From Swiss-Prot:
Keywords: NAD, Oxidoreductase. It comes from Acidaminococcus fermentans (strain ATCC 25085 / DSM 20731 / CCUG 9996 / CIP 106432 / VR4). CDD domains: HGDH_like (cd12184). It is an enzyme of class 1 (oxidoreductase). The gene is hgdH. This is (R)-2-hydroxyglutarate dehydrogenase. It catalyses: (R)-2-hydroxyglutarate + NAD(+) = 2-oxoglutarate + NADH + H(+).
Length: 331
């Protein structure tokens, strides 16, 4: 079976090849994202495509796939918003996704961003890179063991983040719509209002549910402690970007770290150095560095996470091809 894998970076290629030894697919990995007619036409002669985030299987591209004879559409992501699922079903495409992969990858990045903001390391190293070795008042910080950390969303990633913060000595509290068992040793589950009221650092690990809209709103931010740090390594749509900008500018937020943006496809994966960003909110966020830290959706950009995503995607394809079904089928 011939498989086209989109958005594969050079460092990931050995993982795609190593994982394929078990499956024996005829794979071609390209760095391109599925975002134009031309990139869709790359699938000519292939039986299946494996997408990643910011690859858009919209009506235009799905029609091209159908015309080219592509049989299966897979995404090596937990999110599936980049696929027009209803139209793909109309065209008869079996689809599958990767519901989970290394939770440590995303949790570690969230903790890293929080600690960079807490200890002001981005600010400090940007100065020392210019040979300014003075220590100023902005560099002064609390120790994390003297902080309360709030985790919004106690799924697999949120629980790992809670464990890491607990291991560093922080008092960890968390909120989830479900009662979570087995976390008592490292996290106390409380209401969202209590998380907002008490936390010096809040890290978001909730799923995005379109019908519910953003979680981080002006009201959410208003309830937070003055000067608290907020981190979002979950979904860009969970955050009202304009409200966050206002909170950072006013000093309500001590800092904001994110690995995701609402509408990130317009900037992530592109070198826009020296250019004015089309989205004025993104331009404002960038200008707020080092109080705002942005990473370009690389939470899953680790050895273990990529291995998990590729292995599950290959297995999904095998299951769909052999049985027409798989545990991770998009229905």
């Amino acid at each position: 079976m011939k498989v086209l894998c989109y958005g594969v970076r050079d460092v990931e290629l050995p993982i795609f090849e190593a994982c394929n030894k078990e499956f024996g697919y005829d794979i071609k990995c390209v760095p391109d994202y599925l975002n134009t007619k031309e990139t869709a036409e790359m699938a000519a002669g292939f039986d299946a495509v494996i997408l990643r985030g910011n690859c858009f299987a919209n009506k235009q591209n799905l029609d091209i796939y159908k015309k080219l004879g592509v049989k299966y559409i897979l995404t090596r992501t937990a999110g599936t918003d980049h696929i027009d699922k209803e139209y793909a079903k109309e065209l008869g495409f079996p689809m599958a996704f990767v519901p989970r992969y290394s939770p440590n990858a995303i949790a570690e990045l969230a903790v890293t961003q929080a600690m960079m903001l807490l200890r002001h390391t981005a600010y400090t190293t940007s100065r020392t890179a210019k040979k300014n070795f003075k220590v100023d008042a902005f560099m002064f910080s609390k120790e994390v063991r003297n902080c309360t950390v709030g985790v919004v969303g106690l799924g697999r990633i949120g629980r790992v983040a809670a464990q890491i913060f607990h291991g560093m000595g922080a008092t960890v509290i968390g909120e989830d719509v479900f009662e979570i068992k087995g976390i008592e040793d490292y996290c106390t589950q409380v209401s969202l209002d209590e998380v907002l009221e008490k936390s010096d650092i809040i890290t978001i690990h909730a799923p995005y549910i379109k019908e519910n809209g953003a979680v981080v709103t002006r009201d959410f931010l208003k309830k937070m402690k003055d000067g608290a740090i907020l981190v979002n390594c979950a979904r860009g749509q969970l955050v009202d970007t304009e409200a966050v900008i206002e909170a950072v500018e006013s000093g309500k937020l001590g800092g904001y770290g994110c690995d995701v943006l609402d509408g990130e496809a317009s900037v992530f994966g592109k070198d826009l150095e020296g250019q004015k960003l089309e989205n004025p909110l993104f331009e404002k966020l960038v200008d707020l560095y080092p109080r705002v830290l942005i990473t370009p959706h690389l939470g899953s950009y680790t050895d273990e996470a990529v291995k998990n995503m590729v292995e599950v995607s290959y297995q999904n394809l095998k299951d769909l091809a052999e049985t027409g079904d798989c545990p991770n089928k998009i229905k």
